[in-house]
Amino acid sequence: MPTIQQLIRTERSRLKVKTKSPALKSCPERRGVCTRVYTSTPKKPNSALRKVARVRLTSGFEVTAYIGGIGHNLQEHSVVLIRGGRVKDLPGVRYHIIRGTLDTSGVKDRRQSRSKYGAKAPKE
């Protein structure tokens, strides 16, 4: 416990909060170009082939981003928009690709949670 004299001499230093998505550089989204689109297997209790892409961002970072939803049209050189948000069972994946923007198509025949997957309202 510091004395009052010690606190007058040097004030308490504030704790620095470490960002969970440094590649975004305090922006809500970032544009980037896919350098590689591939599948990855999740951590221990889960089993699947998760679709991910390696993306070179305008901020200069190269990150791994998750492609949500069923089916996608991404390939190398596709221009995508990424947002923050990690995938718990994929180590090193801290970003999501936003569906329905730039070169990323929305999910076909999606009826629920459509806004999250860039799907238009179904024709009735």
Swiss-Prot record:
PROSITE patterns: RIBOSOMAL_S12 (PS00055). Keywords: Methylation, Ribonucleoprotein, Ribosomal protein, RNA-binding, rRNA-binding, tRNA-binding. GO terms for cellular component: small ribosomal subunit. The modification 3-methylthioaspartic acid is found at residue 89. CDD domains: Ribosomal_S12 (cd03368). Pfam families: Ribosom_S12_S23. Residues 101-124 are annotated as: Disordered. GO terms for biological process: translation. SUPFAM superfamilies: Nucleic acid-binding proteins. Gene3D superfamilies: Nucleic acid-binding proteins (2.40.50.140). Part of the 30S ribosomal subunit. Contacts proteins S8 and S17. May interact with IF1 in the 30S initiation complex. PANTHER family: 30S RIBOSOMAL PROTEIN S12 FAMILY MEMBER. Belongs to the universal ribosomal protein uS12 family. This is Small ribosomal subunit protein uS12.
